[in-house]
């Protein structure tokens, strides 16, 4: 039986998957575990009442597990791992926080209007930390040869970074960070990612209001 999941719809396109990286993280988990699912696309700017009834805070993603709607991608991914342990996507605890500061640094740099505020260097520092981790472990993924939950969390964030910074700042991950670039390619080329990614123009549109704020 298919699992029900509510995710963000694309702005201005009622039948197209939106650009929420946290929704994609859960979709990637479902795909990698080969679990059947049914998506319900939610307009987060005009939430239907039935959705607010099941998710009073109005946040996506939410997934129905054992008859109850569950919010928060961290919680959902943890419960999916417990309920459907095979194939395992469990990340070894010592690797769970690898790359965890990249998304915040990306958002700060993307919104920055001051080239000298240090936000670009802060992002590069976080990417260099990921580079060093990937180089000192046996890759291609954070925990080694096998993809795990930490990779599925990072993949959508690195995609947003690549698309949004490329569009708004003509910026890309430095060529010197070969392990990070290869890591992103490995993630983006997976069938699970192709099946769940937002179109580039939708990612660009999703960040427009924040860039121009």
Swiss-Prot record:
Query: Where does the chain bind glutathione?
Result: 8, 19, 47, 60, 73, 160, 207
Which of UniProt's keywords are assigned here? Cytoplasm, Detoxification, Glutathionylation, Oxidoreductase, Stress response, Transferase
Knockout or disruption consequences: Mutant develops distinct foliar lesions under ozone exposure.
Signals that turn on the gene: By ozone. By salicylic acid (SA) (at protein level).
Query: Pfam families given for it?
Result: GST_C_2, GST_N_2
Asked if the keyword Disulfide bond belongs to this entry, the reply reads no
A GO cellular component annotated for this chain's UniProt record is:
plasma membrane
Location relative to the cell:
Cytoplasm, Cytosol
Q: Which residues carry this modification: S-glutathionyl cysteine?
A: 6, 20
Positions contributing to L-ascorbate binding? 8, 19, 210
Q: Which GO terms describe its molecular function?
A: glutathione binding; glutathione dehydrogenase (ascorbate) activity; glutathione transferase activity
UniProt function note: Displays a dual function. As a soluble protein, exhibits glutathione-dependent thiol transferase and dehydroascorbate (DHA) reductase activities. Exhibits glutathione-dependent thiol transferase and dehydroascorbate (DHA) reductase activities. Key component of the ascorbate recycling system. Involved in the redox homeostasis, especially in scavenging of ROS under oxidative stresses. Plays a role in ozone tolerance.
Which PANTHER family does the protein's record reference?
A: GLUTATHIONE S-TRANSFERASE DHAR2-RELATED
Q: How does it assemble?
A: Monomer.
Name assigned to this protein: Glutathione S-transferase DHAR2
């Amino acid at each position: 039986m298919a699992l029900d999941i509510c995710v963000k719809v694309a702005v201005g396109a009622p039948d197209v998957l939106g650009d929420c990286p946290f929704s994609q993280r859960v979709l990637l988990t479902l795909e990698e575990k080969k679990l059947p699912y049914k998506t319900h696309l939610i307009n987060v700017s005009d939430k239907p009442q039935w959705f607010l009834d099941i998710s009073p805070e109005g946040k996506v993603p939410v997934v129905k597990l054992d008859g109850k709607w569950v919010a928060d991608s961290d919680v959902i991914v943890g419960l999916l791992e417990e309920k459907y342990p095979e194939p395992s996507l469990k990340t070894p605890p010592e690797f769970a926080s690898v790359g965890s500061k990249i998304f915040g640094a990306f958002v700060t740099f993307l919104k920055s209007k001051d080239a000298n505020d240090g936000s670009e260097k802060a992002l590069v520092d976080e990417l260099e930390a990921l580079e060093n981790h990937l180089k000192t472990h046996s890759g291609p993924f954070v925990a080694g040869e096998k993809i795990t939950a930490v990779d599925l969390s990072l993949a959508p964030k690195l995609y947003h970074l690549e698309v949004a910074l490329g569009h708004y700042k003509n910026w890309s991950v430095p060529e010197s960070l070969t392990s990070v670039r290869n890591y992103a390619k490995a993630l983006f080329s997976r069938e699970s990612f192709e099946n769940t990614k937002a179109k580039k123009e939708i990612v660009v549109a999703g960040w427009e209001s924040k860039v121009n704020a």
